[in-house]
């Protein structure tokens, strides 16, 4: 799956599966660090994999939600007790060493606040099994994206597990779980005939799943779903039929952006399967009917998730260069809080990697202990130090537990001790082992113009980003160069975008990540220390290959160097500056090279910038403070939740293709990118808060600047109802999402005071349209069990307003035509009045046939004529009504001039369309397919007849041999008859044997005949079925091809018509200009003053005439186009009408053939029998022979006339 290509994705995600050993439970010993008491427990997992739970000796049950579990470790990676007494108590197993039986389950609400469940198994194999199973359950992507129904089942499971020692469910747990409205809970319990006192408890068998559903329906009634149910056909009957349900799913729930061939709409039988799955009433389900209860279950079921499971799976192409991906990246990974006084933690590296991060930062400093061990800390601050070696071990432990794709280690190396740098390099080599990429891959040498390897090429590899030194010069000059480089490296951050000093080598260093701290860091640096760095730096430098940091100079220089293995880091302010000044160049840079963005130094509270800013420019490593779960981090987690949570997301195509340029500040549609229109209607909420408060919902969109809309929509606040508020407000419409592949929708819920409840971030490209539950998550991206929002989403390809009518007409032509007819009727009265006015105003000498031509309609819009309500006067009448002194009147029949330039354009007929090359080619292909099919069946028939002929010959030969033996025996007997002592009864015995033989052979031949007849019938029926099916498919393909050909030809004709219109205008202007010149020539014969006056008037009149004539011509051209478009529609409709006719004819043809077939086969067999019997009787034998000529079964290859001809020049007539 690593190299997944576009197309239909085969889902690889495995559903949750809990092993029997986890369900049955296993004995463990539980211990804590802060106590010397050990507790024997039985640890279990519920069958759905929602919870860990254990009972101790007092039969008290404790739960651990598996969605909170981050990791499961055993053996040397598990926590070990430090107290010797505790260790002695735990060493109770008799199979395996204690270290190998240790299990640590790491859990917590976020990456910082984590806890440990420490266990000891009695056997090593048990420890390994439980560790693997628990980690698998905790990291299951389908479990992290459960359906609404699964979350409600999880709440039910929790109630069933938290029972009293007597096995009863305490009602206080139900009140605690649904605490928003105690009165409602009480009423709902009473509706289920259950006790309602908080101090009561109920037997588990009384609180079945069915009772739980009834309880929920009473607690949280859903009138909005009843309305939807009624809207789709359940108005008079309490159910939807299978056809109505199919329409609902295909019209409302299906994504219109999907290809209908690759992702066809659901068929009736598929919908029936869904009905049988969700309808609780079996009798209704068998009839293909679904009740409102079943409908509600479907809406909350796994098939109706708001995001397709395929998007959660690893579904993107992972074989492109590393620079073509967004890479989940962390800044100052070791910190657990602020930048100045926060604690550093080795565990943060584990948690960050387990969460899907693929790029971590190591801020390395010189250790000041006697052991001279390098440390990781935030220099010149109050943050604590942690061991560099322990960090490397933690990275090695968790690097590939959740993703197999490469890890990038971003070293910020401040260690000025050669010895300690040598230790750092040694630790990397020894601890990472083969996972550390020491040398570049053979296919991707470190050369100019060579792209970076892909994530698939680098699977299970660790890459180091550290300063790379050049070693080409001598030792003396090398020291000088290193000194210069060190000076450059630790200069002020503004130097990052200035040209490098002449002393800097080709492999210059990047500006350090924390340039804002450089002033204070620089005081600890001096030339001698930097000069002594050479050998130690080489130790670390040898680890660097594909990620070589260099100081950024300019996009032009980077493009000229064209070295993909060089990368630069930008503090957010400088990155923003580059994005503002050179957005297109920044995107181009990121196509070939990597860039890393990190937060500015003034973010001492570890807040984050919005990563979307830099994703828009194609920056790969947009590093954030993972310890701070602000909105920026939430968007980051939403981004990397998809594509298998691999930590890599393929950039949009325009950010990868070298032949395309992309401006992230574009406001219009980008050629080649299909924009989307997204509409979100917030309908209702369920169990939004555990308090009786008002709630509201906000909707945001993040993406390109043109797509981003913060707080685009906010519902009204529900009045004291957090259980089932219903809003039913007008939807928020994001009319044009220019780059949907990089846009995400955020739906957030707040209490009336503004307190955050939960949210969900959804990629626009992954959103499924229709009615869906959006199960909310908290600010740490942990799923909330009960809170959900019910929405209706519409998502489709964006259509500009100018083409909206065209799309409407194409998608629903019948409704559109009816609407046009309705409008025409409404305007009919006014139109008739206008026509009468025009007739009255027409010239007296005008013929009746000419008058109506003056009444005009507006130009056709989308191929449908809209009759105007007010018809302006024709140009000729306008000129007559206001004659100017000395002006030349336009001719009465203005149409003559216009008609003289108009060209007749006829729509191509169906017969002409059939002559098109692509259509003829398809017909020839179909002819060949039919010919091959008939040949195959002809061969089968021939083989069958040969087989029967062989059998007949065997029967005949056997018959002749046995008859000859009997006759020979008869002759011997006749000789014996002549002897006097011989008895006379032998003659009668021979005759009886011969008669029996004839009867036996006749029966065999009859059986053979019957068998042949049946087999020939079956074979011919098989042929007819194949022919019929193939012809039916051919009809579909030919109709589709003819429709495509018609559309293509008609579009070409309309394009050509535009050219013709332009030519006609030029021709009209030319003719009118010629007339003007003639009038000017006539005026020259008059005196000069009169001539000048007339000339001026003629020019003024000419301008008016040209304007009017051009207007009339455009109207005439518009009418012509309308007629042509209408004719095009008629032809396309005629083509579509052909399909049912041809299908009916085909059905009739083969019905007749099937009816005649048994008689034809019978006649053939009988005729063959008669011919062979007469032939054999001439040779003294009676048996039937079977003809070996298949042509007698009317099974010859069809002639070219039958299949439509085989002459290339001839038009094929079958099926069209």
Swiss-Prot record:
Region (Disordered): 469-534, 834-891, 963-994, 1071-1095, 1173-1216
Residues with Phosphoserine modification: 236, 417, 511, 582, 887, 978, 987, 1199-1200
Low complexity bias spans: 491-501
Regions of compositional bias (Polar residues) in chain numbering: 855-871
Catalytic activity field: a 1,2-diacyl-sn-glycero-3-phospho-(1D-myo-inositol-4,5-bisphosphate) + H2O = 1D-myo-inositol 1,4,5-trisphosphate + a 1,2-diacyl-sn-glycerol + H(+); a 1,2-diacyl-sn-glycero-3-phospho-(1D-myo-inositol) + H2O = 1D-myo-inositol 1-phosphate + a 1,2-diacyl-sn-glycerol + H(+)
S-palmitoyl cysteine lipid modification positions: 17
Biased composition (Acidic residues): 507-518
Pfam families: PH_14, PI-PLC-X, PI-PLC-Y, PLC-beta_C, PLCB1-4-like_EFh
Modification type Phosphothreonine: residues: 509
GO biological process terms, semicolon-separated: activation of meiosis involved in egg activation; cellular response to fluoride; cellular response to glyceraldehyde; cellular response to ionomycin; cellular response to vasopressin; cerebral cortex development; fat cell differentiation; G protein-coupled acetylcholine receptor signaling pathway
Post-translational modification: Palmitoylated. Palmitoylation at Cys-17 by ZDHHC21 regulates the signaling activity of PLCB1 and the function of the endothelial barrier. Palmitoylation by ZDHHC21 is stimulated by inflammation.
Function summary: Catalyzes the hydrolysis of 1-phosphatidylinositol 4,5-bisphosphate into diacylglycerol (DAG) and inositol 1,4,5-trisphosphate (IP3) and mediates intracellular signaling downstream of G protein-coupled receptors. Regulates the function of the endothelial barrier.
Official protein name in the record: 1-phosphatidylinositol 4,5-bisphosphate phosphodiesterase beta-1
Organism of origin: Homo sapiens
